[in-house]
Curated annotation (Swiss-Prot):
Domain of life: Bacteria
UniProt keyword list: Aminoacyl-tRNA synthetase, ATP-binding, Cytoplasm, Ligase, Nucleotide-binding, Protein biosynthesis
Enzyme Commission number(s) of this protein: 6.1.1.23
Gene for this chain: aspS
Disulphide-bridged cysteine pairs: none
Subunit structure: Homodimer.
Organism this protein belongs to: Azorhizobium caulinodans (strain ATCC 43989 / DSM 5975 / JCM 20966 / LMG 6465 / NBRC 14845 / NCIMB 13405 / ORS 571)
Function: Aspartyl-tRNA synthetase with relaxed tRNA specificity since it is able to aspartylate not only its cognate tRNA(Asp) but also tRNA(Asn). Reaction proceeds in two steps: L-aspartate is first activated by ATP to form Asp-AMP and then transferred to the acceptor end of tRNA(Asp/Asn).
Binding site residues for L-aspartate: 175, 221, 450, 491
Compartmental location: Cytoplasm
Main subcellular localisation: cytoplasm
Sequence segments annotated as region (Aspartate): 199-202
Positions annotated to bind ATP: 221-223, 484, 536-539
Protein name: Aspartate--tRNA(Asp/Asn) ligase
């Protein structure tokens, strides 16, 4: 007999009745029923009920065990008494009558229980993550994560992609976030950087003559953590293709992502034909470049109905051609209580309020705005928005560049409050035609809005003859249920176009050569047209596990302060280590 087990705790069925078996695992739950001890023994594979009778030689040892002790049990498999079966367990028709018990690993008093699904403070869960990971829900999330990654890998290979590994120690480059720097012992005063993404390497792979690359890539960015972004590191499905257009990338990626959502989405409907929504349209209709299309509400520009009206606040705003008034429809939201609640919510978001019109039975508009603009304009707004009696509309006014994010939040809030969002589905879409450049108020100059290596629509001709802020890029995202889950672009593979693109953003050719020397050099020796993207594995897993916090699908995450409470990172380096690296701390004054 094997030293620890002949079967796992999820393997025993009626077929083993009468067999002598050995199992090992954790004491999940211990119950005393009239002097007979019942232990639910748990391992990675499942649960098995073990019975310790007072007549058994193992009973005395069993009386000493506590929750989460690791034990080995020998015994005979028998059917559970009629009426005590558990249909929710694979082993629910049988139990083990124990004849021998060995304690393999006793456990101290638990800081959080493994049995059950109670909420515990996050700092406790992260400090004792090894206990937290034993809990059924999060254990299942981690297993599902592995299965999703395996499925992505197989689907990519099925599409003709080959898996490569790119370096982890690389050069620092400006890619939109702070780098994690690694001091070089061999080259005093110089630093490696952990890659924010394998962007340059994957393009170099295409220039090296390979055709379709992918990897499950670790990425590192020193940025502030959020619930949908882990501090420090994350993983992405990174891919690149040679001799492709934007449509070719879409055709390769769409079945991979759609297939994974269909496989692991629990039967929820998944968008089959993904819409392609231009960036500007997404902001205009949904107030977001990652719209949640489960929400049916579409915002509309209703400026004409307020221009020259008696509602002077909006009428004066509209004298500036940059300003607009947008309407958010609110089907079934035409009650004073709901409209006032939305107005209070807007004030809580730092806004002066949220204007509204509600239509009561009989079709007459009500509310301060309706009273000011009159029945004719009110009826025209209702007709444009397709509203009916009992509905409402909410209004946001000003410069859309400044208010679109709030308008998007208001659209989401209305959809949630009126229960218009179908949470039992996955709505996926391509967001396309991103602006190539944006104006940086902080630096008072034009800068790249997304990825500096993307191809501008119109190529070198657009860079030479067009207002930079009107240039669009061959750049695209995948949005799913209000999250950006992937981003990519067709690359700028002509060296003169690359230099010009950086020049417009304030970087001269010498800077380009200094920062991107390897890629610039490769461009001189025949670079193929190429493009690709990267999908955020953590966010995809988060959506498929039905959670809203990435720490629920990550093995050993840091907390919101970028601290690893289990391992004690970051920690101080020893004087010897600092000396070897030729560095000394210059700490801020306390």
């Amino acid at each position: 007999m094997h030293r620890y087990r002949t079967h796992t705790c999820g393997a025993l069925t009626e077929a083993q009745v009468g067999d002598t078996v050995r199992v090992s695992g954790w004491c999940h739950r211990i119950r005393d029923h009239g002097g007979v001890l019942f232990v639910d023994l748990r391992d990675h594979y499942g649960l098995t009920q073990v019975v310790f009778d007072p007549d058994s030689a193992a009973f005395a040892a069993a009386e000493k065990v506590r929750a989460e002790w690791v034990i080995r049990v020998d015994g005979r498999v028998r059917l559970r008494p009629e009426g005590t079966e558990n249909s929710e367990l694979a082993t629910g028709k049988v139990e083990i009558y124990a004849t021998d018990l060995e304690v393999l690993g006793p456990a101290a008093e638990l800081p959080l229980p493994v049995f059950g699904d109670q909420d515990y403070p996050e700092d406790i869960r992260l400090r004792y993550r090894f206990l937290d990971l034993r809990r059924e829900r999060i254990h299942g999330n981690i297993m599902k994560r592995g299965q999703i990654i395996d499925s992505l890998r197989q689907r990519m290979k099925g599409q003709g992609f080959f898996e490569f590994q790119t370096p982890i120690l690389t050069a620092s480059s400006p890619e939109g976030a702070r780098d994690f720097l690694v001091p070089s012992r061999i080259h005093p005063g110089k630093f490696y950087a952990l890659p924010q993404a394998p962007q340059q390497y994957k393009q170099l792979i295409m220039m090296s003559g390979f055709d379709r690359y992918f990897q499950i890539a670790p990425c590192f960015r020193d940025e502030d953590p959020r619930a949908d972004r882990l501090p420090g590191e994350f993983y992405q499905l990174d891919l690149e293709m040679s001799f492709v257009t934007q449509d070719d990338v879409f055709a390769a990626v769409e079945p991979v992502i759609r297939g994974v959502f269909e496989e692991f989405g629990g039967g929820k409907p998944v968008t089959q034909n993904w819409p392609r929504i231009p960036y500007a349209e997404a902001l205009r209709k949904y107030g977001s470049d990652k719209p949640d299309l489960r929400n049916p509400l579409v915002m509309q520009n209703v400026s004409e109905h307020f221009r020259g009206s008696n509602f002077k606040v909006f009428a004066r705003l509209l004298e500036d051609p940059k300003n607009e008034v947008w309407a958010i429809p609110g089907p079934t939201g035409g009650s004073r209580a709901f409209c006032d609640r939305m107005n209070s919510w807007a004030q809580g978001e730092g806004q002066p309020g949220l204007g509204y019109i509600m239509w009561r039975e009989g079709g007459e508009g009500a509310g301060p705005l309706a009273n000011n603009i009159g029945p004719e304009r009110t009826a025209a707004i209702r007709e444009q928005l397709g509203l009916k009696d009992g509905d409402a509309a909410f209004f946001v006014a000003g410069n859309p560049e400044k208010f679109y994010k709030f308008a998007g939040l208001a659209r989401t809030k209305v959809g949630e409050e009126l229960k218009l969002i179908d949470t039992e589905r996955f709505e996926l879409a391509w967001i396309v035609d991103f602006p190539f450049y944006e104006w940086s108020d902080e630096e008072k100059k034009i800068d790249f809005s997304h990825n500096p290596f993307s191809m501008p629509q119109g190529g070198l001709e657009a860079l030479n003859g067009q207002d930079p802020l009107t240039i669009k890029a061959f750049q695209y995202d995948i949005a799913c249920n209000g999250y950006e889950i992937a981003s990519g672009g067709i690359r700028n593979h002509r060296p003169e176009a690359m230099v010009k693109a950086f020049e417009l953003a304030g970087y001269d050719e010498a800077t380009v050569i200094e920062r991107f020397g390897g890629m610039y050099r490769a461009f001189q020796y025949g670079a193929p047209p190429h493009g690709g993207m990267a999908a955020g594995i953590d966010r995809i897993v988060m959506l498929l596990c039905g959670v809203s916090n990435l720490r629920e699908i990550s093995l050993f995450p840091m907390n919101q302060q970028a601290l690893d409470l289990l391992m004690g990172a970051p920690n101080e380096a020893t004087p010897k280590q600092m000396k070897e690296l030729h560095i000394r701390p210059a700490l801020p004054a306390k």
